[in-house]
């Protein structure tokens, strides 16, 4: 039976993680390793300045006092004698669209699985209501990953519209869109009168063309975006070389 490692960034007690577990319960041997609290926005950070605690909970899940990437690292290297066959992260409470993936702990947990040699899927619900819909999508994809042999080190970012299953329009393979700059931080004062700051909402869609994840969700489709860890802007390599040549000759 396949070994499936589940994690998230909303925390080990999040409804989305429970929904993912319940949806995949018949698809393999499950192990859940997730942060002990909400770690949204943690991205790919690892805890390097202190030791981590891995705690077994009464429901069979494991909690870690660290980041989503920590959880997958420990889940792969510290919980099982054998490596998992697939890492699934989610179900996130809210979408991870466009350049959200640069900040997302949900995507980072899946990416850590990919970095450790496994195929991985990050799944997010673009809302907080129909987790059962996202769970059915996850179960379908995990079944397909088994029958069609999703290659090792594959990384899929999946976003699901927050609608009943019957209202899903289909599935689109998409590219990442991108957002404009985020809003300015919100300034507040604490009880002692000191100024504090809340990080503001993400920016508006700057690229939501028909082939993007934004457009797929807006039209009611599940969005599946294959991701890679190579952030090199290959089209700019020659431009930068020419710029340096001009600089050295000036």
Curated annotation (Swiss-Prot):
Q: Which UniProt keywords apply?
A: Cytoplasm, Hydrolase, Metal-binding, Nucleotide-binding
Q: Which cofactor does it need?
A: a divalent metal cation
User: Chief subcellular site?
Assistant: cytoplasm
Gene name per UniProt: surE
The species this protein was found in:
Chromohalobacter salexigens (strain ATCC BAA-138 / DSM 3043 / CIP 106854 / NCIMB 13768 / 1H11)
User: Which family is this sequence assigned to?
Assistant: Belongs to the SurE nucleotidase family.
Stated role: Nucleotidase that shows phosphatase activity on nucleoside 5'-monophosphates.
Q: What's the protein here called?
A: 5'-nucleotidase SurE
Q: Write down the InterPro entries for this protein, in alphabetical order.
A: SurE (IPR030048), SurE-like_Pase/nucleotidase (IPR002828), SurE-like_sf (IPR036523)
Where can this protein be found? Cytoplasm
Q: Name one GO cellular component term.
A: cytoplasm
